[in-house]
Amino acid sequence: GGSGGSGSSGNFTTASNIHMSSVTNTSIAGTGGTGGTGTGTGTGTGTGTGTGTGTGTGTDTGTGTGTGTETGTGTGTGTRNGTNSGTKTGTASSYRGGGVAIQPVTLTESLLNK
């Protein structure tokens, strides 16, 4: 806070019962920082006055950092569709006694699998 100025009293010689008086000055401290210095003035009327003012400013600064972790899981599904098709052909022949020849027969895969 600021320190108050000191007042000075007037010095009179016109009467013997006039005394010098001194005044103690106080000041109100500023908040938040260092106060200024006070100034005081005195007038010579047998009293002294002084005023002191103090101002202060303060600044608070802060920095912060934050870290975070994010994890996630996921599943994926898929379908596969396919068809396999084919044809197999073959010939079969046989000979039965009696002089009768059997004609070749074409066999497909569907007939062979039965």
From Swiss-Prot:
Chain residue ranges for the region called Disordered: 23-114
GO cellular component, one term: perinuclear region of cytoplasm
Annotated stretches, region: 28 X 2 AA approximate tandem repeats of G-[TN]: 30-87
Keyword check for Nucleus: yes
PTM description: Phosphorylated with a circadian rhythmicity, probably by the double-time protein (dbt). Phosphorylation could be implicated in the stability of per monomer and in the formation of heterodimer per-tim.
Intervals holding Sequence repeats: 30-31, 33-34, 36-37, 38-39, 40-41, 42-43, 44-45, 46-47, 48-49, 50-51, 52-53, 54-55, 56-57, 58-59, 60-61, 62-63, 64-65, 66-67, 68-69, 70-71, 72-73, 74-75, 76-77, 78-79, 80-81, 82-83, 84-85, 86-87
Organism superkingdom: Eukaryota
Biased composition (Low complexity): 80-91
Primary location: nucleus
Biological processes annotated in GO: rhythmic process
Statement: the UniProt record of this protein carries the keyword Nucleus: yes
Function: Essential for biological clock functions. Determines the period length of circadian and ultradian rhythms; an increase in PER dosage leads to shortened circadian rhythms and a decrease leads to lengthened circadian rhythms. Essential for the circadian rhythmicity of locomotor activity, eclosion behavior, and for the rhythmic component of the male courtship song that originates in the thoracic nervous system. The biological cycle depends on the rhythmic formation and nuclear localization of the TIM-PER complex. Light induces the degradation of TIM, which promotes elimination of PER.
Subunit structure: Forms a heterodimer with timeless (TIM); the complex then translocates into the nucleus.
Protein name stated in the entry: Period circadian protein
Gene that encodes it: per
